[in-house]
Amino acid sequence: MRKTITALAVALIATSANSETIEQRVAPCLACHGEKGQSETENTPSLGGQQAPYTLIQLFMFREKLRTFEPMNEMAKPLTDDDLRTFSDFIAKIPKPAAPADAGDPARLQRGQALVQQHRCDTCHNPDLSGKENVPRIANQREDYLAKTLAEYKDNSRHGYDASMAEVMAPIAAEQIADLAYFVARMR
């Protein structure tokens, strides 16, 4: 079923390149990543407010299969360089996801905040973790996606264009990842 949906989405993107607006072309992306930029799909990142240069790099990597996740590789395959820039610029203008309404567990928030400070996440991701240029916005990202991604950096199974996250995650204990993701997902 997922392959069928992906194939239909790819066909829609490829055939509509010249006749549809960017809003129409991005609709298949937002079906998984959230219509308003806030994903409701498990382990799927929210794209709202993401840095355009970061998104451009990720889309390029998916298109060229330098980053592998088959649905995304297929979706990005027909996109031209201009398409990648257009999609990235559009995504950057979608409002970033809001923090969850509940205040959260104070002890977990405190542990997560201490990890953010100790490992200086703000150095690359900005004090509000909004990201900059080719560094992603991680504030208010889906907690499950953050935990999965951080664990992949820690075990070196996620490779990007930059090895710095593997180095950052090396000293962080596996059991601390949940608190780190919990805090970052609830940034206020």
Spans of model-derived segments:
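Hydrophobic h-region of N-terminal signal peptides that target proteins for export
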Residues: 5, 10-18
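Sequence/structural segment immediately N-terminal to covalent heme-attachment motifs in c-type
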Residues: 18-38, 99-100, 104-127, 142
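Protein kinase-like catalytic domain
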Residues: 33, 63, 125, 154, ...
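C-terminal capping alpha-helices of c-type cytochrome domains
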Residues: 77-99, 144, 168-188
